[in-house]
Structure formats: C-alpha cells, structure tokens
Amino acid sequence: MSLLTEVETYVLSIVPSGPLKAEIAQRLEDVFAGKNTDLEALMEWLKTRPILSPLTKGILGFVFTLTVPSERGLQRRRFVQNALNGNGDPNNMDRAVKLYKKLKREITFHGAKEVALSYSTGALASCMGLIYNRMGTVTTEVALGLVCATCEQIADSQHRSHRQMATATNPLIRHENRMVLASTTAKAMEQMAGSSEQAAEAMEVASQTRQMVQAMRTIGTHPSSSAGLKDNLLENLQAYQKRMGVQMQRFK
C-alpha cells in the first residue's frame, strides 16, 4: 500500500458514511494526484461542510495544507487552529511538545505513527496544531504518520461505540437502530437503481420500506415490530444485485 493510499484510508475511516464521504474521498484523491492545487478554495469548501466534527475538519485541513503546494505566506485558518488546540488543555500542550521532540528524531511515516500511538487524542491534536501553526517543523511523511495515528485512535473509539450499539440490549435502541438501518439500505437501493425493470421493482421495495419506517415512527410501535425489517430488505437488495450482475459486499 502506498503512503498516500494509507493516509486516505485512515482519514476516511473517521468520516461518517454518506454522500459527503464520497465527496471528501474524491477531493483527497484529486489532492494526492496533484489535480487540485487551490488550497484557499479547498479550505473554504471544507469549512462549510455540514455533519463533520470540528476535529475531523481540523485533521482534513491539516492534510490538505501538507499536501497542496501553496505560497509560503498563506494565512492559517482559524477553524483548523481551534480544532487542533487540544481543547485548550495545558496538559495536552505539554504532552504535544514532548511528542514533537520525539517526532523530530523520526524520519519515516511508520516510525512516527508508532511513536504517536502511545499518546492521547488530545495530545496528538495539539501536536498537529504546533506543526500547523508553524511553531515546529517535521517532514511531510512524519506529519502524515501523526495524522494516521490520530485517525486510528478516533476510529477505535468510534468502533467501540458502534459495537456497543450493535450489542445494546435496550429494546427501544435496537428497534430504532433496525429502522435506521432499514432506511439507509432503502436509500442505497434507490441510488443503485438504474432504469431497468428490476430497478423499478427495487425502487418500489425501497419506497415501501421508507414509508413503513415513517409510519412506525409517527404512530409509535412496539420494539419487536421492526424485527426482520432490515434482513428482508437486505435479501431484496441482494436478489436485485444478482439479477443486475452487481456484487456489492458493503451492504452485507
């Protein structure tokens, strides 16, 4: 795996799924391929994106700044600085300075990532802030290693939270989760559907599902009433994919 592929993988792992994720992936690909060289416009676009947490925006802004060639005196952006200040906690700043000194001695991406992984997310963000604000300089490879370590920590905590959701025993949470997943799968079916006969069938199933979920939410239903909702939908989606000759593992 090339360095930039690895960076893209880690960064995208902390972006919530949806159309915006696809858009960010495209921007990252363009930047890494040297196709997008207008850092100012890129940062303005990033700043106004909805859904993303300030820290995710800060990390993306940091990556764009590292990889897009720009004039030396280009202004640093406040939204990135605020996100990478370690919540203003002086402990984070102290640890960030210690980490920075260690990173100065590193020359490889993987070496930097290994060193950084033993620090907290707050300290890692503060360290990125130091580099972003030009208070310290490290090689681009080392800075990207720091980025990936931060993303790995964030993705780990998100994964734990998703796992807790998947194993939640509260029937109301499970009920709502099934309806959300059914709705999302229905949306995916609608996006995949082209204009063939089978597509019309898939659209019909998806539309009915979404109406059903809407009705269940409006009138309030028993937690067990959603059992099987997502599974039925997934079976329909997989049958439709087979007929269309499409294999999309990610919906399983």
UniProtKB/Swiss-Prot annotation:
Keywords: Host nucleus, Membrane, RNA-binding, Viral matrix protein, Virion. GO terms for biological process: viral budding from plasma membrane. A motif (Nuclear localization signal) lies at residues 101-105. It is found in: Virion membrane; Host nucleus. Residues 165-252 are annotated as: RNP-binding. GO terms for cellular component: host cell nucleus; membrane; virion membrane. GO terms for molecular function: RNA binding; structural constituent of virion. Pfam families: Flu_M1, Flu_M1_C. Homodimer and homomultimer. Interacts with NEP. Binds ribonucleocapsid by both interacting with genomic RNA and NP protein. May interact with HA and NA. Cannot bind NP without genomic RNA. Plays critical roles in virus replication, from virus entry and uncoating to assembly and budding of the virus particle. M1 binding to ribonucleocapsids (RNPs) in nucleus seems to inhibit viral transcription. Interaction of viral NEP with M1-RNP is thought to promote nuclear export of the complex, which is targeted to the virion assembly site at the apical plasma membrane in polarized epithelial cells. Interactions with NA and HA may bring M1, a non-raft-associated protein, into lipid rafts. Forms a continuous shell on the inner side of the lipid bilayer in virion, where it binds the RNP. Most abundant protein in virion. When expressed alone can form virus-like particles in transfected cells. This is Matrix protein 1.
